[in-house]
Amino acid sequence: MSSLLSKTRRLNKILQKTGTEPVAFQDICTLLSEVLECNAYIVSKRGKVLGYTFSPGFECEAMKKKVIEDKKFPEDYNLTLLESNETLANLSNQGRCVFAEIGDCKTKDKISTIIPIIGSRERLGTLILARFGKEFTDDDLVLVEYSATIVGMEMLRALQEDLADQTRKKAVVQLAIGTLSYSELEAVEHIFEELNGNEGLLVASKIADKVGITRSVIVNALRKFESAGVIESRSLGMKGTYIRVLNEKLLDELKKIK
């Protein structure tokens, strides 16, 4: 069995999870690092580190700080990555650190390969590989470009799932608002003006006096929102009622009504 085939099959095992379970970017980085003996990084379009694995014995405090602590590459370096629309293989560091502010690199024989991650004709991120003293072969590049395609598909799926989730949350809020009477809607607007954020303490009697409505109107409005799952509330007795927004679309939709 060829080395490329065995490596590809190992990668495919990551993909053979349940259909609804997303492929972890970290798993792909770990596998690439193991089979290619390299550092592997998956970076979003905005430079956020989505997954990474360092090869054994890798010692670069500058890179570890960016990846582990900051979890983000510098903007200027990320812009350089985004300039490339095709694979750039076996780039020598020529004694310089990839981060301009660092200057000289302690490792003189570092070799990097940059692979764009593209989905639906849109740049989604970058797959970066780096190792020392040994160039990436054509078989290696076949594997990493295949990996970049997989990552692109997963990024698109994540974006689509997020869009669907946001749409669902918005629809739930709109339905909840639609169940309110005019006076209940007026009460809700004043409630969240008083909260001035996603959570806080509400004294229903104060709002009732201020708006000129009964306390029961406020209670009914809160019950409807709680039943819809857009807020949670907890009575604190004489202190009032603690309210927390569970659906972040609620405040946006209330602003639109105003």
Curated annotation (Swiss-Prot):
This is Global transcriptional regulator CodY. One of its GO terms (cellular component) is cytoplasm. One of its GO terms (molecular function) is GTP binding. It comes from Clostridium botulinum (strain Alaska E43 / Type E3). InterPro entries: CodY, GAF-like_dom_sf, GTP_trans_reg_CodY_C, Transc_reg_CodY_N, WH-like_DNA-bd_sf, WH_DNA-bd_sf. Belongs to the CodY family. Its main location: cytoplasm. Keywords: Cytoplasm, DNA-binding, Repressor, Transcription, Transcription regulation. Residues 1-156 are annotated as: GAF domain. Pfam families: CodY, HTH_CodY. GO terms for biological process: negative regulation of DNA-templated transcription. DNA-binding global transcriptional regulator which is involved in the adaptive response to starvation and acts by directly or indirectly controlling the expression of numerous genes in response to nutrient availability. During rapid exponential growth, CodY is highly active and represses genes whose products allow adaptation to nutrient depletion. Residues 204-223 bind DNA. It is found in: Cytoplasm.
